[in-house]
Amino acid sequence: MNQDEHKIVVRRMAGLIAAASVLIAVYVLRLIFLQLVNSDSFKAQATNTTDYNFTVTAARGDIVDSAGRRIAASTTSYNVVLSKLLMGDEDLDAMLQRIVELLEAHGEKWNDSLLIGEPDAAGHYSFTAQADSTSDQKALAAMKDSLGLQQYATADDVMEKLVEDYKLESYPLHWQRVLGGIHYEMQQQAFSNVNNFVMAENVSEVTVATIKENSLTMPGVEIVETSTRSYDEGDIIPHVLGRVGKITAEKWKVTDENGQTTYPLREKGYNMNDMIGVSGLEAVYEDELRGKDGVETITRSSDGVIVGTAMTTVPEPGHTVQLTIDSAFQQAVDKALARNIEMINSTYNSSSSAKAAAGAVVVISTKDGSVLAASNYPSYDQNLFATQYSQYSSDPGLPLLNRALQGLYTPGSTFKPAVAVAALDSGIINRFSTVYCNGVYTYYDDYRPKCTRHGHSGNIDVITAIKWSCNIFFYDVGRRTTSDVYDAYAYKMGLGTRTGVEVNEATGRLTTKNDSNYIASLDVQAAIGQGNTVVTPVQLATYAGTLANRGVRYRTHFVKAILDSNTGETLQETQPEVMDVVEDKGETFDLVREGMKGVAQTIPALAGYPYTIACKTGSPQRSEGLSLIHISEPTRH
């Protein structure tokens, strides 16, 4: 190689080295830019993660008795929930089939409120709604309305509509029914990008584990931890506690008379699938028992793998509602009531008219009107309500009826102390006033009511009249006092009016001159607790408390306090509330109570009791049975 050629080679090599150096420099600078300047952006692109927020249901507050013993509590359970957002482009019906097969393999059930059974051999369907069930027929009508069908539509018509709407023609009849039912349930729960669909509730831990193991192949199928209501003793005041249940479509979407639609529960922060108090104290104290839901954020990669979870908002449990009821005492009263009814039935087994089919007992504290026990017989078990509702609702003994608060009964002679208070307080009679009893009341020519004269006859004063329940005395005193006057006193003492309890109660009624069947003789009938007068057991208990308190009537109540569920701190305490007062003029209540103490001395089981007892029995002429008001004083003999 000559010198000129060597120079050319050197120049070319130098050019190549320079070009390579430039390329290397550009590459290095690009790497620096990617790793240092824009690393976060490219890292996100590489991982391609997405955050999803899920509601974490707060635990519902407990309901406890006066001693703090738990009556109703929340226990953790697991639901299978479908998220439309997470499902993406998955074949929904194919996914539903997989879930159903998985649930069936583990003995689970799924939500399906479609009132249609499986097809018969000919491929026809039938409604499962009971013809004699008002609730079933109402649900059936609502189902047809929601599908845009006429009320005369058959079960086949309903299924044809569902198959057409959700394109289920290619599926066998069995799967058409299964998938059609699930789609209908989705419609009821308003399944959308906003509302998840609760497909199955309270599933087993085995089912939970299986679904989590298959999460990569079942996108959008989530296990959500929630809380369900449970009862340590399901038979303790179930009528008063009430129940929780799912939000119904009617409560979720409200349309007023002007056609305006609102969503009041959504505005209060509820989701459509939430549980809510539907009756009793569970409904009345919903705002206290309901907690504040939390939010859990789940981060998923582009291939569906969960790469992170965080509790964005921690859920707060609801408050504890403490009752005035003592659960041990309540159970003792329940047993005593059942035992006495069984004793009556065994004693009078030859006389159907003397048998006792049902009963109620209410015990209140005279200090402040707090309810210590409220028993119904027959009753039911909260833990069995869902599975045995059909038996409970068809039972002729009406175990679902809250007799203690809503049963209306003729008070009979238990009404007589109210008439005595009215007559004494109004000056119609005094301690020395008497009425002659010869067994027949002869004031009316065409109406001659009688008296048994049990234990008495001749001139009877108010103490003796109450002790021996003399009808003649109260016929005459009632006529002279008039129903206008003694009714006013009875109302003040708690009869024929609301007692103030937190849950639904019947008002009852007293006999008045405004009654369509009123005649003058009704005044004497009503004076012994007959006529048109009907009251509730809780009113009788409130009335007895008013007599014990010398005319002061407190609001009858079941709730003692609202407590912080974490600390036990008292947030709100029920204070004694005076609802009405009968002014005690002189010795009115002393005389009435003296007569009622005399009643106790005529009853062998009470005569030797270690406490002073004042009471009054009543045996109305109607067939409701026996009533009794009973006052125990804390003074030993």
For every predicted segment, state its role.
Residues 72, 78, 299-316, 325, ...:
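Beta-lactam-recognizing serine transpeptidase/beta-lactamase-like catalytic domain environment
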Residues 229-231, 330, 508-510:
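A short acidic, often aromatic-flanked loop/helix-cap motif at beta-alpha or helix-coil junctions
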Residues 1-314, 350-360:
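Membrane-proximal periplasmic segments of bacterial cell-envelope enzymes
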Residues 202-203, 327-328, 481:
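Short beta->alpha linker loops
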Residues 320-330:
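Bateman/CBS regulatory modules and CBS-like beta-alpha motifs in cytosolic regions of diverse proteins
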